[in-house]
Amino acid sequence: MFVDQVKIYVKGGDGGNGMVAYRREKYVPKGGPAGGDGGKGADVVFVVEEGLRTLMDFRYQRHFKADRGQHGMSKGQHGRKSEDLIVKVPPGTVVKDEKTGQILADLVTHGQTAVIAKGGRGGRGNSRFATATNPAPEIAENGEPGQERDVILELKVLADVGLVGFPSVGKSTLLSVVSSARPKIAEYHFTTIVPNLGVVETGDNRSFVMADLPGLIEGAHAGVGLGHQFLRHIERTRVIVHVIDMSGLEGRDPYEDYVTINNELKEYNLRLTERPQVVVANKMDMPDAEENLQAFKEKVGDEVKIFPISAVTRQGVRDLLFEVANLIETTPEFPIHEVADESDTSVMYKFDTEGVKFEITRESDGTFVISGYDIEKTFKMTDFSRDESVRRFARQMRGMGIDEALRARGAKDGDIVKILEYEFEFID
């Protein structure tokens, strides 16, 4: 089974906690603070592995959580940074943020990497907070939380050639004849619901990958039937082989099929029409095929080169493969997203934290709820088991303008204020 889209959860490792410690050595009566910083949490890094062909492995493991950094230690020793969590993906994987739809990475070449979830920085130890007025601070930070998100992985088939055409025109049969692929073949529509890949050898030391793509019907660009699944897989192909049934047994007109398929390709993505297209008249071994072919040629004109074949008897297949191989050699790849520096195999990760620093809402019971990236991060990095840390957090809230905003919303002494799952009283 070919899995081409899957949703997974990734979380960068939390930073290690900073430590509160003091030098306790003989002959050093006033050693001062010596708590080390926590280590950085591990990133979740996606790496392209050319040996992979599907996203099947992600059906069995959908959660990837990187290790947190080591906690700070005494004697000013910093915690160790955790090793990044490496997640291998097949070439052609597009990674999207499930919430925003933003494309985080388009991974094509072997060894290409992208950081999908950043690990948090380590919390600072108490030696970082020493000042002239507070030479022995009882204060240290918790590690910064690692970023977490749900992402959608989409696999684009990295085939050189894509077979397109209406269902049951003989695409699966053709692929099985010219390669070692063994797609399921039957005489009903939508037999092929996932792409089948096959390596084709032309006999003159040339080879290419051909994909028998899911059947296409009118309205595919709008998502009708299997449309979007089909069109996602054809975006990366360099040559399109358009297979048309000349037998007439399905009751459809070959020319109307030809026009409909091309309209769908044009509607979905204009760049699809830039690819060279080879028109294949299949099922020429059937009784009315020759007559239908002549009528088809009259309608399309002389500018369209047509290859009459029979996938069953292999008539004309050899000439078709030579033509396709020639086109591949002269046709460049069509990347979906332009890359500024093709020599760089890494993807720059940008995490936008701009926006509202905090937001205050009020629940039906009168509780004030404070939310926002900055305040929640500050809250998580505060060690509430130490009084100095609590006082520092209160100062940080005042500095962000939260106290003033609460008063403006009508908060009074004793009112309940909630951040994440924690509650405390407002003191004016």
Swiss-Prot record:
The keyword Metal-binding applies. This is GTPase Obg. Its cofactor is Mg(2+). It is an enzyme of class 3 (hydrolase). Its main location: cytoplasm. Keywords: Cytoplasm, GTP-binding, Hydrolase, Magnesium, Metal-binding, Nucleotide-binding. It is found in: Cytoplasm. It comes from Bacillus cereus (strain AH187). NCBIfam families: Obg_CgtA, Obg_CgtA_exten, PRK12296.1, PRK12297.1, PRK12299.1, small_GTP. Residues 350-428 form the OCT domain. Mg(2+) binds at S172, T192.
